[in-house]
A protein has these predicted regions:
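Residues in well-ordered beta-strands of folded domains
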Residues: 62, 205, 353-356, 374-376, ...
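Conserved ASCE/P-loop NTPase catalytic core
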Residues: 2-217, 229-240, 249-311, 316-371, ...
Length: 586
């Protein structure tokens, strides 16, 4: 049996050993290999693309299609360019209705450029390919992004090209032919003059999310296979002091590069706690520029200098939580006003507090709340009824969890015949679809309680899924779930007996609010970690599952089954002949 009562230090990332790193200024110069340190795969892919014998002129990069990411990739590509500043392109001379092209002799020529990297997250046809304009008989040619990137690299978001397929077809043609032809965007309105084509050589980096890449692969299967591929790594694993330093330097660089205040020495632990909540891992921190910039932008209004303190960051996070917390508070009020029935004291047979995460479309913050699961057992033919499934409110994953739970129980009891009980399980006061298996451990405990006729401690909530051997498996949304139950207990008054049971594998995901951490430190709230569902049963039902020289839950259930089977044997004649049972010896 493995039951771990977690200390308050287990509930947040450990930052005490990194105080010396936090005190450093984390200055970065232009030649700092920060990008290659944090994005080694993407850096290597860029090197391959810029090689003189590159296997393809196209590169696919999995990354959010936002300007912050495109600019990061562009800056990294610029540092790798060996021919940067080389004059390429030409000059179009317009004389009346005659246009001719000559080689560029200076950067001032209208279609000349110094080899460079150009990035755009959204473009229209004229912006990408340039255009011919005519006003009062005068003709002018305007270069597009492909001309600006001539001899260099064009970085563009995939959603632009997927939304405008003709742009992609023309861009691919230009890259493959290494030549730019002037054509009319509207076939009904041809160009008023003939414009000579020009040599144009560039490499293209297509940036997209997983869905965009999948759509592009379907549209261009051969090119997708041949293109160089890499990904922007959006998280950094914290394995030692060096990786912590690396992350601090990345955050500082992102803030300074965007003219925002960077974290001060005492702000780093607070930022790391919030970062761990974002990634869902104590030892995984985000590299997302958008996430970092959001924190720095919101706290900037609270500080005057070029750094912000831990107190200022805490205040900003509290303000954000309050600003976004109306919906969560209303849901808590429903429980506190007993419109949704959740008990946090006492005992009930076949009733348990599970934990759920609520996400509303359009709402920026997920929040947790307890869910009451009930189980009723009666004499029957061994059928387990999932009411959610029967009412078509249960998803496939939830149904799978129910079947796994039943398989564990039947295997443990080792019955030679069908169990003489039927059971029904449901999420009480749940009126929308339920899916996922994160409540399967709670459902199993409720079922065992009902079968054994032993009450469940209502002061304790539980989350986690189980496999067919009863092992507790990790689930998501852990911080929100625990904080949701804690908020209800706190509003009703903490008794010191309340707490939450979680799978041991979930401990590494904890990054809880300071108020909850303080309650655990003071012994007013408890969090237990278990490896197996049988470890949770003594906490919830005050009886062990199996053992010698003591009353156990398995023994209690088997005795009830034996009694029910004996009664069933007595009534094996049809009702009109029931009097014959009197002649059957006991």
């Amino acid at each position: 049996m493995t039951i771990t009562k977690l200390a308050w230090r287990d509930l947040v990332p450990d930052t005490d050993s990194y105080q010396e790193i936090f005190a450093q200024p984390h200055l970065i110069d232009e030649n700092d290999p920060l990008f290659s340190d944090t994005q080694p795969r993407l850096q290597f892919a860029l090197e391959q693309l810029l090689h003189t014998r590159a296997s393809s002129s196209f590169m696919l990069a999995k990354a959010p299609e936002e300007s912050e990411y495109l600019n990061l990739i562009a800056n990294a590509a610029r540092t790798l360019q060996s021919d940067a500043g080389q004059l390429v392109g030409g000059h179009y001379e317009v004389s009346g209705h005659s246009i001719r092209l000559r080689h560029a002799v200076s950067a001032d020529d209208n279609f000349a450029t110094l080899t460079q990297v150009v990035a755009a997250d959204w473009v229209e046809a004229e912006q990408l390919f340039g255009c011919l304009r005519q006003f009062n008989g005068d003709i002018t040619l305007q270069p597009g992004l492909v001309h600006q990137a001539n001899g260099g690299i064009l970085i563009i978001s995939l959603r632009t090209l997927l939304a405008q397929p003709l742009l992609w077809m023309r861009l691919k043609n230009i890259v493959n032919r290494e030549r730019f032809d002037w054509v009319a965007f509207d076939e009904s309105r041809p160009l008023p003059v003939s414009v000579p084509s020009m040599p144009l050589k560039l490499k293209v980096i297509l940036v997209g999310e997983r869905e965009s890449l999948a759509d592009f692969q379907e549209m261009e299967p051969e090119l997708s296979e041949q293109a160089i591929y890499s990904e922007f790594e959006d998280t950094l694993q914290i394995v030692d002091a060096e990786s912590v330093t690396q992350w601090c330097r990345w955050v500082t660089f992102t803030a300074r590069h965007n003219h925002l205040p960077a974290p001060g020495a005492d702000a780093w632990p607070v930022l790391i706690r919030e970062a761990a909540r974002y990634t869902g891992e104590q030892e995984t921190l985000p590299l997302s520029p958008q996430w970092i910039l959001r924190q720095c932008k919101e706290v900037a209004s609270l500080c005057d200098g070029d750094t912000f303190s831990g107190e200022q960051l805490n205040l900003m996070l509290q303000q954000r939580e309050w600003r976004e917390g109306f919906l969560a508070e209303r849901m808590q009020d429903e429980i506190l006003q007993e419109q949704i029935l959740i008990e946090t004291e006492g005992e009930r047979i076949g009733q348990i507090n599970a934990l759920s995460v609520i996400e509303f479309p359009g709402h920026p913050r997920a929040f947790g709340e307890p869910s009451r699961i009930s189980c009723v057992v009666h004499i029957g033919d061994g059928e387990f009824t999932d009411i959610e499934r029967k009412a078509e409110l249960g998803g496939n994953i939830h149904a799978k969890g129910m079947m796994i739970m039943q398989a564990f129980l039947m295997s443990e009891l080792q019955l030679e015949q069908q169990i003489p009980f039927s059971a029904s399980l449901t999420f009480e006061q749940s009126y929308s679809e339920v899916d996922g298996d994160s409540a399967s451990m709670a459902e199993l405990c409720a079922l065992i309680s009902a079968l054994a006729d032993v009450p469940v401690n209502q002061s304790i909530a539980i989350t986690g899924s189980v496999d067919q051997f009863g092992r507790a498996q990790p689930v998501g949304g852990l911080n929100e779930k625990i904080e949701g139950f804690f908020a209800i207990c706190q509003q009703r008054e903490l008794t010191g007996k309340q707490g939450v049971i979680i799978p041991t594998a979930n401990v590494r995901h904890l990054s809880l609010h300071s108020e909850l951490v303080k309650a655990v430190e003071e012994g007013k709230f408890t969090i237990w970690a278990v490896d197996d569902v049988t470890d949770a049963l003594p906490l919830l039902l005050n009886l062990v599952w199996d053992g010698e020289d003591q009353t156990t839950l398995m023994q209690t259930i088997q005795e009830r089954i034996a009694q029910a089977s004996q009664q069933e044997g007595r009534h094996r004649f049809p009702w009109p002949l029931r009097w014959l049972n009197w002649f059957i010896p006991n």
